[in-house]
């Protein structure tokens, strides 16, 4: 294993920090968005069947997860606030936004990053409500499917999930960009059958890029962007 700044981890690649493994997704406002590589644990989104993350029981588990990371060296300086947009499927913003150190991806974020997020072995929850009781200030609030949240199936598809049902928790976090994390060094693993010469060349690009004096805020190209740039 070797250590590099988390902002230098290619999107879609796995890194280790604070005793856990994550997949780098994006560089946003000076922070690196990442998701836990695998499901952490299973629990209801909310034991009362309410799809509002601001009051949902799942937040207690997410707080516990961050506390566990802190036992392994994390802090509020290295794991910044994840402010989630709780916009419902129809675009209503009755629930507003909600911030936690360890949060969940939204449906919109999953749609953006799904191609680089590893599949999990079970369903896992997203932060996005299926719909909310009073979108647009209705005079008669509805309870129809307001117990539903979006979730991701083990094959990568996504759909409706009852908030009271047990589902996987896969925390999403924003890391300080200069945080040192560990990645697997090329010399420590044998090439797998699925690795092509092109991907090996990409790994060399990452290795060289990591050793350069880069400007704060820069990150390496994703594999797809690197391929496209190479072909131009």
Give a label for each model feature.
Residues 189-232:
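Acidic, low-complexity, intrinsically disordered interaction modules
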Residues 1-187:
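Collagenous Gly-X-Y triple-helix signature in extracellular proteins
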């Amino acid at each position: 294993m070797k250590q590099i700044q988390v902002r230098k981890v290619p999107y879609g690649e796995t890194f280790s920090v604070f005793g856990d493994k994550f997949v780098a997704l994006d560089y946003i406002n000076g922070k690196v968005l990442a998701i836990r590589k695998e499901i952490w644990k299973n629990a209801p989104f909310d034991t009362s069947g309410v799809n509002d993350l601001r009051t949902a029981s799942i937040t207690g588990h997410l707080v516990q997860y961050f506390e566990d990371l802190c036992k392994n060296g994390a802090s509020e300086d290295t794991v910044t606030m994840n402010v989630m947009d709780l916009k419902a499927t129809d675009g209503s913003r009755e629930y507003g936004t909600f911030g936690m150190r360890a949060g969940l991806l939204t449906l919109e974020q999953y749609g953006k990053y799904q191609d680089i997020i590893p599949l999990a072995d079970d369903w896992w929850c997203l932060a996005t409500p299926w719909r909310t009781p009073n979108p647009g200030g209705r005079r008669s609030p509805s309870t129809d499917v307001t117990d539903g949240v979006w979730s991701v199936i083990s094959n990568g598809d996504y759909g409706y999930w009852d908030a009271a049902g047990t589902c996987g928790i896969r925390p999403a976090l924003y890391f300080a960009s200069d945080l040192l994390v560990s990645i697997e060094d090329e010399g420590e693993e044998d090439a797998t059958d699925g690795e092509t010469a092109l991907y090996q060349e990409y790994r060399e690009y990452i290795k060289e890029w990591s050793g350069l004096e880069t400007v704060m805020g820069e990150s390496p190209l994703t594999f797809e962007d690197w391929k496209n740039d190479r072909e131009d």
